[in-house]
């Protein structure tokens, strides 16, 4: 069976589908010594040689049999990139080393946000878990500064217009707080850049603390300290895969 090249390479651990597509567009990917195009289809059985950015790789066609997923408690101050020109700490520095694969982050958290961040060796799984069409829920605990009124609280469940389209919280729950600083739990089924902060800012509030506490069916363990991680068991990995039709 022939599949799109970017999908095959993502599934077998060469990177996320978006990352691979960007490399293909820049003519940086060769299969069997031929430059490939976005959307080009091929049978996995004929792949003998993979070249990415002039680096020669042996085909890792069985890597998905040892699919791994990590749950990491990201601390504030770490940036979601592999290398940073300003030499800031990155989310990959504390992860366990892999000999025949690479960790791919499932979504992002900005520099000043913390909490649950998933990593996988399967680029297709990462792609699907972040794509809005699969409606994967994320829950955040946020501390918000501002003057609250009954009218404002009602608006929090209404769609607001941002520069890149409309957005709204799937649910919002007041937790605690007095004065102008209050804690809420909010949920969404998308992960646009700084989307939680931008919704609040549109309504005239400032988020001064943001922690992701849940992604899909997974919750951030209270015993998992910032900067540490746990490996998901087979059951949790299977549940993730089923949510995005990979099982």
Curated annotation (Swiss-Prot):
All residue ranges annotated as the S4 RNA-binding domain in the record: 3-73
- Where do the catalytic residues lie? 110
- Any GO BP annotation: enzyme-directed rRNA pseudouridine synthesis
GO MF annotations for this entry?
A: 23S rRNA pseudouridine(2605) synthase activity; RNA binding
Q: Which reaction does it catalyse?
A: uridine(2605) in 23S rRNA = pseudouridine(2605) in 23S rRNA
Is the keyword DNA-binding assigned to this protein? no
For this protein, what is the EC number?
A: 5.4.99.22
The family annotation for this protein states: Belongs to the pseudouridine synthase RsuA family.
- Function of the protein: Responsible for synthesis of pseudouridine from uracil-2605 in 23S ribosomal RNA.
Q: What is this protein called?
A: Ribosomal large subunit pseudouridine synthase B
Organism phylogeny: Bacteria, Pseudomonadati, Pseudomonadota, Gammaproteobacteria, Enterobacterales
